[in-house]
Every structure is written in C-alpha cells, then in structure tokens.
C-alpha cells in the first residue's frame, strides 16, 4: 500500500522515511519467519518457534518475495540502487519453492527437501486458507519468469486451463473460504483474484474475457448476500469495480492494468484537474463479451494492458465487442 501510494503520487509523506520503515520491517528476523526466509531463501515448513508458530510456510515465502519486490520498486524510484538490488534479488525467492517434478510451488524443510505426499488440491497448514493450485500463481512480480519456470507459454496455458476445469469431486470437503469455485479457482478467496487475467500473458485473452464476464455476472448479485466470499478489506468489491471497467492490476505496484472485458457500454472516471478517463464498449452485452479490437484516443491500440499514466491523462479507450472470441489484438508478449 505504501509503495503503491508513493509510485502513484498519492499522499504527502516522507518517502525516504517510509522506505526505511519498509526495509526495517522486512529485516525483523524475529517476526513470523523472516529470519528463516533470509537464511534459506524460503520459510521451511518444519521449523516453528514462538515467532513462526502458525506455519503457512509456502504462503509466507511467496508473499514475502512479492513484498521484497515492492520495496525494490520504491528504492529504485528513489535512486537507492543498493537497496533495490538487494530486494530485487530477494523477490526471486519464489523460485526456491518451485518443484519441477510436481510443477507446483511446494513446501520445503530446512534441509532443502520438498515435502512428501504433496497434493496441490489439498488444504494444509503450509498454505494460508488456500491450496497449491490457488497459491501457485502468487508471483505477480514476475509472471514472465513464472512462465519460463513452468516450461514456456504452452505449458503455462495448459496449467491455467486446468485451474479452471479441474473441479473438486463430490467427496472433497472444501473449507469455508473456498467459495465461488470455477474448477480450482476460488473467487471467494482473494489469492486467486488475479489468475483470470494471466491468459493475456500467454496470448489467449478471450479466456480472460470469458471468465471475467462469467464471474461478474454470476458471482456478484445486488442482494444482502451478493458477494460470494469474505469482503476482506474491500478486495471483493475492488475486483468488481476494476473488472467492470475492463481492466485489473495483476501487479498492484507495476503501473499496468491487464485488459479484461468491460461490463457496461460507457464508464467515466472523473479525475483531478478536470480530466475524464472514459471506457466505451457500445455493443457489450452478456453475449458480446469478447473484444475484437481496441482503440486509444481514436487510434488502434496493440497492448494487452493500459497504464496508470493513460488513465490519469484522461484517455478514451474504445472496445469493439462481439459474441465470438477474437484473436489477440496486441503484439505477442
């Protein structure tokens, strides 16, 4: 939150002091396994103490790596190369829990051995309120690196397809936080929220559009119980607002928003300085959820994302919509 605010110019605060606080917090060895994370490059699942009692070793490793990336981004912007280099290196620690044999992120012990009898659809103490399917994608800082680690775009796309089609069996006892399920995707629990938008990274944007439209229309209702899961700091609603406008921040501090599918024919965001950001999709409907082409300020647009600067400049994005999947309008990534 601090880094996102700083990079977007929100708030009046001492950025250098804020960075110092972030770095200090990320180096509190006695706090929730951070010392173990720094020592091994991951939090081992078999080491617990008074500061690391709840386990969640895999979740901590992946989330600490993203936090490190955020610190690196802020340090880089402030010109602190030493801190930026250190934390960019730490942000790659996600690789330390990837098991090429299972092709999943997997808990490891303090000897470096991956946990035995691992099943990605099991809910265990090593992953916070999720399973191995849902946390595999928690590398928002380096999706391209995750694709390479997995074996390339084709294999990554196959894994994404499986995420949305591998349904729990009738015998599976799902925990209370696994709601809004599409295959192993759990929209009622926030760790999954960016996964729909990853199809853009493998040049299959029509799947992002299909699933985003489905979630918006089926899993959000204008009723007292209209959300399919815990709101958790407003994230369920934030996902909907972003997605309804046709984009979503896979990497919240990256400055880019992956294009999905707009929900309404016209949406406007009134900005400081009298500017207005506009999204137009005159033909959009339940059936016409597929993007055929995109224009930015009247000119053909060939990116899978929009930028924060384009929003704040008061740009006009226009989407040509259709009822059949269109090919990627953007240059392959």
Regions flagged by a language model, labelled:
Residues 1-7:
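Active-site-adjacent, His/Asp/Glu-enriched structural segments that form or flank metal-binding
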Residues 7-278, 283, 309, 316:
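Active-site core of glycosidic bond-cleaving carbohydrate-active enzymes
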Residues 272, 296-299:
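Short strand-turn-strand beta-turns centered on an Asx-Gly dipeptide
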Residues 274-276, 286, 301, 324-326:
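Generic "edge-of-domain/loop-turn" microfeature
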Residues 282, 299, 322:
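Surface loops and adjacent helix of pleckstrin homology
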Residues 287-293:
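Beta-strand-rich binding/interaction modules
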Residues 302-307:
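Short, solvent-exposed S/T- and G/P-enriched segments that are highly enriched in secreted/extracellular
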Residues 308-333:
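C-terminal beta-strand-rich structural cap/linker in extracellular carbohydrate-active enzymes
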